[in-house]
UniProtKB/Swiss-Prot annotation:
GO cellular component, as recorded: extracellular region
Compartments (UniProt record): Secreted
Organism listed in the record: Equus caballus
GO molecular function: growth factor activity
Name of this protein: Neurotrophic factor BDNF precursor form
Coiled-coil positions: none
Function according to Swiss-Prot or TrEMBL: Important signaling molecule that activates signaling cascades downstream of NTRK2. During development, promotes the survival and differentiation of selected neuronal populations of the peripheral and central nervous systems. Participates in axonal growth, pathfinding and in the modulation of dendritic growth and morphology. Major regulator of synaptic transmission and plasticity at adult synapses in many regions of the CNS.
Modified how: Mature BDNF is produced by proteolytic removal of the propeptide, catalyzed by a FURIN family member. In addition, the precursor form is proteolytically cleaved within the propeptide, but this is not an obligatory intermediate for the production of mature BDNF. Can be converted into mature BDNF by plasmin (PLG).
Taxonomic lineage from the root: Eukaryota, Metazoa, Chordata, Craniata, Vertebrata
Residues of the signal peptide: 1-18
Site (Cleavage): residue numbering on this chain: 57-58
Length: 247
């Protein structure tokens, strides 16, 4: 399983063209540098004939730098109390690609792999009884996840509460790439559209509600200034409860 996971990570970064981290440190609101740029093809076709030989040796460094960059950005910028009520998370759900991504973001795969390692530390008997499928576990709220483009979003709310235009395409050295956002929201066609699953309706009012997180995206404000900003996108479906009065 470990070898399979490492192969998956290598394959993932094999088709990703990351911007140099030295340039990433110098980006501002008007900068177009961004570390998570993905193209399709070999390392040689993207960066020249010498890139293939040094590509594999730099994968670990690239991955480490991208994670550090995301953590640094999360420490520098914090939403205020009013704006963070329904959008208080920092996630990596944005990808620049020439076509629709075929898999969830890499950090999602890393989380699944971590869960596998945690399960591997338990005995076979414990794992068998802890398997949600064996216990018949169901989610409290039904949700759906999909990649959407800026053409679907059009506008978004930034961390200052202002409305900005989400740019559909991002200029790169060899053309343009589209911005894709991995969104998760409550399923309007699911069985929980009338309330959360497993809640006693005699005592509680329940509702499945889509919540948002901040992600970094290329946008344009009302003054036509283009830059990378944190915007809200749908990232989860949670259950909200209120107690019934008069009982």
């Amino acid at each position: 399983m470990t070898i399979l996971f490492l192969t998956m990570v290598i394959s993932y970064f094999g088709c990703m063209k990351a911007a140099p981290m030295k340039e990433a440190n110098a980006r501002g609101q008007g900068s177009l540098a961004y570390p998570a740029v993905r193209t399709h093809g070999t390392l040689e076709s993207v960066n020249g004939p010498k890139a293939g030989s040094r590509g594999l040796t730099s994968l670990a460094d690239t991955f480490e730098h991208v994670i550090e960059d995301l953590l640094d950005e999360g420490q520098k910028v914090r939403p205020d109390e009013e704006n963070s009520k329904d959008a208080d998370l920092y996630t990596s759900r944005v990808m620049l690609s020439s076509q629709v991504p075929l898999e969830p973001p890499l950090l999602f795969l890393l989380e699944e792999y971590k869960n596998y390692l945690d399960a591997a530390n338990m005995s076979m008997r414990v794992r068998r009884h802890s398997d949600p499928a064996r216990r018949g576990e169901l989610s409290v709220c039904d949700s759906i996840s999909e990649w959407v483009t800026a053409a679907d979003k059009k506008t978004a709310v930034d961390m200052s509460g202002g409305t900005v235009t989400v740019l559909e395409k991002v200029p790169v050295s060899k053309g343009q790439l589209k911005q894709y956002f991995y969104e998760t929201k409550c399923n309007p066609m699911g069985y929980t559209k009338e309330g959360c699953r497993g809640i006693d309706k005699r005592h509680w009012n329940s509702q499945c509600r889509t919540t948002q997180s901040y992600v970094r995206a290329l946008t344009m404000d009302s003054k036509k200034r283009i830059g990378w900003r944190f915007i809200r996108i749908d990232t989860s479906c949670v259950c909200t409860l209120t107690i019934k009065r008069g009982r």
